């Protein structure tokens, strides 16, 4: 297959890899863009081609949490320009839409269009707002989470109103739920900053983990080439990338290897129990870098980076004398996942509305 300059340009823009490296990857993949991305990543030559890295819209995200902290809704509405995104009328529209979605238990955009607000159909109301504001607008998405008995939800909207997060927790009692509200909101702030994609490694499938491990390995090996040149300490190449790969047998084998190393170092066996827990934690941390990048529970907590979010939750539960489990998580960032195909975003918004 002939590799065109536009294909090379597209791959280069999406991965940040060099032009010749992109051309070779496309030749090797016979023009398959996704395979070319994987080839570059395994060689440590490019980042994942994430559509979210090429934000193509303006707009706002809104979060509304009910007074009893049992229901939370998040909404994204897109505009053509950031100027309109700062317009007070548009800000009110986004908030009112979020309240309307939550109050009326609306689940889909079609349901929203057919619903009534202020005595008229929502679609009619929305079109009148477009006329007032003077730009094409689109309700891109919304989601509501609800807490079960004994549970609680929390939400956070960043100061620029472009990033919002909802988190829901199951608790053993209403008392526990009330006590962890502020902590849960801090977790929302953490997620806004650190961008986890899922709650836990348990949501990964095996093929995804294997592909990401190869990409991580390639990335570290490439960085080590530069560290050799600079005569600096090298990255240790992990055996694994996720807790999903760390079976009980693998942990047991790692523990035996650590014991053998302690024996080799001449450490008295009587103190092994004091040393091993920290070394096992270090082994797990070294071999769960994918979890640290993409999972909420696996990331190191921004409020205390000596512990993971999972550990922070366990500590908080112990502190309040209850049980806490994160069961729902939603993060919206304006425009994420929208790929800009042209400079005419008005046309793109119009296409979404059609």
UniProtKB/Swiss-Prot annotation:
The keyword Protein biosynthesis applies. The keyword Chloroplast does not apply. GO terms for molecular function: translation elongation factor activity. It is found in: Cytoplasm. PROSITE patterns: EF_TS_1 (PS01126), EF_TS_2 (PS01127). GO terms for cellular component: cytoplasm. InterPro entries: EF-Ts_dimer_sf (IPR036402), Transl_elong_EFTs/EF1B (IPR001816), Transl_elong_EFTs/EF1B_dimer (IPR014039), Transl_elong_Ts_CS (IPR018101), UBA-like_sf (IPR009060). Residues 81-84 are annotated as: Involved in Mg(2+) ion dislocation from EF-Tu. Disulfide bonds: none annotated. Its main location: cytoplasm. SUPFAM superfamilies: Elongation factor Ts (EF-Ts), dimerisation domain, UBA-like. NCBIfam families: tsf. Associates with the EF-Tu.GDP complex and induces the exchange of GDP to GTP. It remains bound to the aminoacyl-tRNA.EF-Tu.GTP complex up to the GTP hydrolysis stage on the ribosome. This is Elongation factor Ts. It comes from Campylobacter fetus subsp. fetus (strain 82-40). The gene is tsf.
């Amino acid at each position: 297959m002939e590799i065109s300059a536009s294909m090379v340009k597209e791959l280069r823009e999406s991965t940040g890899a060099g032009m010749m490296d992109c051309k070779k990857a496309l030749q090797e993949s016979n023009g398959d863009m996704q395979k070319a991305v994987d080839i570059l990543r395994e060689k440590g030559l490019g980042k994942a081609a994430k559509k979210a890295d090429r934000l193509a819209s303006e707009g706002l995200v809104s979060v509304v949490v009910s007074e009893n902290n049992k229901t939370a809704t998040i909404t994204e509405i897109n505009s053509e320009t950031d100027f309109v995104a700062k317009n007070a009328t548009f800000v009110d529209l986004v908030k009112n839409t979020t309240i309307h979605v939550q109050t009326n238990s609306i689940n889909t955009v079609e349901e929203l269009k057919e619903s009534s607000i202020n005595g008229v159909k929502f679609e009619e109301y929305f079109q009148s707002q477009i006329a007032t504001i003077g730009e094409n607008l689109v309700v891109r998405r919304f989601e509501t989470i609800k807490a079960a008995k004994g549970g609680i939800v929390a939400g956070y909207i960043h100061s620029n109103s472009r990033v919002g997060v909802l988190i829901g927790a199951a608790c053993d009692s209403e008392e526990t739920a009330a006590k962890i509200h502020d902590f849960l909101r801090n977790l929302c702030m953490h997620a806004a900053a650190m961008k986890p994609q899922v709650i836990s490694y348990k949501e990964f499938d095996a093929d995804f983990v294997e592909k990401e491990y190869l990409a991580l390995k390639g990335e570290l090996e490439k960085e080590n080439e530069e560290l050799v040149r600079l005569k600096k300490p090298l990255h240790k190449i992990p055996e694994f990338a996720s807790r999903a790969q760390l079976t009980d047998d693998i942990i047991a084998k790692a523990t035996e290897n650590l014991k053998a190393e302690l024996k080799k170092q001449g450490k008295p066996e009587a103190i092994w129990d004091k040393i091993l827990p920290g070394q096992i934690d270090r082994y797990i941390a070294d071999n769960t870098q994918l979890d640290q990048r993409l999972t909420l529970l696996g990331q190191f907590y921004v409020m205390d980076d000596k512990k993971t979010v999972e550990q922070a939750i366990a500590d908080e539960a112990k502190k309040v004398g209850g049980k806490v489990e994160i069961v729902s998580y939603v993060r919206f960032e304006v425009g994420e996942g929208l790929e800009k195909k042209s400079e005419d975003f008005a046309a793109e918004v119009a296409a979404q509305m059609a």
